[in-house]
């Protein structure tokens, strides 16, 4: 379904979770300082989303130990058009999130009603994807993961 829009918005934004949050209203929140990468802004209240499942998987599992078989529910904000029109979708700077260009991370700065569009399973690390970002003046490698849909719903 690459490139297909789930709602009438400029592009898709995805949020991954080990739990199914279908129909739940997410509120922006500050991050736990221990769960963000070094140098990442943890104080700004937000809901983290990515412009691609690849980026979202890299952002979520980068801090874990290569979770082969990990299943993640894929959510999209059902009120994304409203969030765009009210300027509540924010692209963090590299200073705020050093790997944001690689992961496609965006922040939702207002409540978002989540809709599950499926579930994916992490298969393995894609060592051929040479992804890098700059951190503290140094080129830092980031892993990309192969994954597959285990359940996929397409809903408008």
Where are the language model's segments positioned?
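Short aromatic-glycine-(Arg/Gly/Cys) micro-motifs in beta-strand/loop hairpins
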Residues: 18-40
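Short, hydrophobic/glycine-enriched beta-strand segments
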Residues: 12-18
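Conserved NAD+-utilizing ADP-ribose enzyme module
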Residues: 2-11, 38-47, 53-156
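A structural detector for beta-sheet-dominated domains
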Residues: 17, 29, 73-77
């Amino acid at each position: 379904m690459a490139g297909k829009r789930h709602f009438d918005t400029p592009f898709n934004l995805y949020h991954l979770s080990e739990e199914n949050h279908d129909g739940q209203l997410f509120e922006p929140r500050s991050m736990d300082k221990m769960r963000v990468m070094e140098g990442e802004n943890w104080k700004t209240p937000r809901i983290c989303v990515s412009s691609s499942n690849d980026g979202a998987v890299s952002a979520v599992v980068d801090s874990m130990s290569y979770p082969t078989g990990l299943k993640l529910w894929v959510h999209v904000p059902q009120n994304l058009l409203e969030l765009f029109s009210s300027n509540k979708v924010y692209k963090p700077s590299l200073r705020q999130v050093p790997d944001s260009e690689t992961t496609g991370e965006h922040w939702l700065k207002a409540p978002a009603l989540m809709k599950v569009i499926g579930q994916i399973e992490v298969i393995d690390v894609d060592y051929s994807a040479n992804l890098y970002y700059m951190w503290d003046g140094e080129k830092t490698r980031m892993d990309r993961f192969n994954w597959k849909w285990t359940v996929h719903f397409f809903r408008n």
